[in-house]
Swiss-Prot record:
The modification N6-lipoyllysine is found at K63. Belongs to the GcvH family. InterPro entries: 2-oxoA_DH_lipoyl-BS (IPR003016), Biotin_lipoyl (IPR000089), GCV_H (IPR002930), GCV_H/Fam206 (IPR033753), Single_hybrid_motif (IPR011053). One of its GO terms (cellular component) is glycine cleavage complex. This is Glycine cleavage system H protein. The glycine cleavage system catalyzes the degradation of glycine. The H protein shuttles the methylamine group of glycine from the P protein to the T protein. Gene3D superfamilies: 2.40.50.100. The glycine cleavage system is composed of four proteins: P, T, L and H. It comes from the Bacteria. Its cofactor is (R)-lipoate. It holds the Pfam family GCV_H. Binds 1 lipoyl cofactor covalently.
Amino acid sequence: MFDESDLVYSKEHEWVFIDDDIAWVGITKYAVKKLGDIVYIDLPSQDALIVQGECVGEIESTKSVSEIYSPVSGRVIAVNEDVISSPGLLNSDSSVWLFKAECENIPELMDWGQYSEYTKE
């Protein structure tokens, strides 16, 4: 759905696609690979106010449970119900979005090149 070069990335391994003042948020291939098979996901509710850097949900895999941190501040305007009912979608397609938020200010995040360097092992 999204090309990696069109996205920006957080240090907590969320990706963001910016469309005017709307941010589409997902988790990166790198995070999905580290997590393994994803079996459960908890996301913020629609209309929730979110703050950049704060925990907004949880993702559970066969290996671990991790928190989801919001890469943006604003109001959640949509939640991807498909990924809640079928969290394994993230294992087959990391471009699956988690939630959309209307943002007041878009923060400085890493571009694809910076994120690639950040995740180099």
